[in-house]
Amino acid sequence: RNTKGLNIYAPTYQSHYAFRLAVTALVTSALYEAGGEHPNVQDALKESEAYLLEHLPKLRRATADAMYNVWAHSYGLQALIRLRARALAAKDAPKVKRIEAVIATQFDRLTRYESVDGGWGYYDFRLGTKKPASSSISFVNATVLVAFDEARKAGIKPPQRLVTRAIAALKRQHLPDGSFLYGEYLKMAPRRGINRPAGSLGRTQVGNLALRLWEDKRITDKVIVDWLDRLFARNEWLGIGRKRPVPHEAWFQIAGYFYYYGHYYAGLLMDHVPDKDRPRLQDHLATTLMKLQEKDGDWWDFPLYDYHRQYGTAMALLALHKCLRKPEK
């Protein structure tokens, strides 16, 4: 409706249900992390909590070939973990129990929609089977693994089989130069533009983060810092796709929606860089994002129906929150 009719494939209402829930979850996490204690923020969190608790358990894939719901289950988990912490702080035991029940449904859906190859994809153009034959997609696997780590750290154990298979699938797509394949279906074309370092720039941050969280020793401090430096030094390889309405039309087949996604996970990596590197990397990230804030205060990178301003702003805020200096003791 704000995109001049240039929109991505979204069959049946469940596609938009998935978009809406994923974006609501991201905004919920952003408000929780960066919104402060203002009454309006607390009211918004109450409303989003009620929406997520009611609707996340109802979400399914849209059709046999379109599974955007995997994004909502992943970002939904991250929001639910934060809402659970909020309920624990308020000593609201019934609310904690209800949130944990919904978390269990998200584990169930991610089990149900896991690719036969391990990990997840959001399209199954192969067979459209009950157990998806979708190609395992590197950045989807990494996104889910980051959410699973948050659950694990909150004392809620994700299904081990899913974790093991997703890590294996992500490692299969990790190239010797540090890039990540877009998806396993491209394993026979590792030097195609989209799979080269510039094409992987928005994916490598989340891939590095996921493997680091799940204790892959190859993801050293140096690897993380080098790829963050590349993100800032070569930012326009990613930025040239920003706001272009056709997915993958930019250099190295980069789609616009990787811009704030990549910077969001770059923000999360700030917790994993050496103290000596953190201030300059935080400054690079903050400067990069603040220069791109729109006149009305939001951020967006790809015209996705009516969801782009919300998800872009949420990801930018979550990244900027990680750029704040910790007060000196």
Predicted ranges, named:
Residues 1-329:
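Preference for long, amphipathic alpha-helical scaffolds in soluble/luminal domains
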